[in-house]
Amino acid sequence: MAVEKTNSSSSLAEVIDRILDKGIVVDAWVRVSLVGIELLAIEARIVIASVETYLKYAEAVGLTQSAAVPA
């Protein structure tokens, strides 16, 4: 995936539109320790995308499989 460079500035609306179109994932892991004792651990994965973009990529990796309905 190539990074596109332009000389013109982008408006906030264009940036938000691009993020929703392509999607962005923030994966964070934080651990707070004091004298070797873990006090707090936080793991987070934040996905920012439009519903259409999320469903397209989630289907590709098998996250949208529906539960079978008994007949």
Swiss-Prot record:
Ordered alphabetically, the record's keywords are: Gas vesicle
Question: Coiled coil located at which positions?
Answer: none
Q: Using the UniProt annotation, give all residue ranges assigned to the region (Alpha helix 1).
A: 12-22
Annotated segments matching region Beta-strand 1: 26-34
Keyword flag Signal? no
In residue numbers, the region (Beta-strand 2) covers 38-46
Query: Mind telling me what this protein is named?
Result: Gas vesicle protein A
Which source organism? Answer: Microchaete diplosiphon (Fremyella diplosiphon)
Q: Which gene encodes it?
A: gvpA1
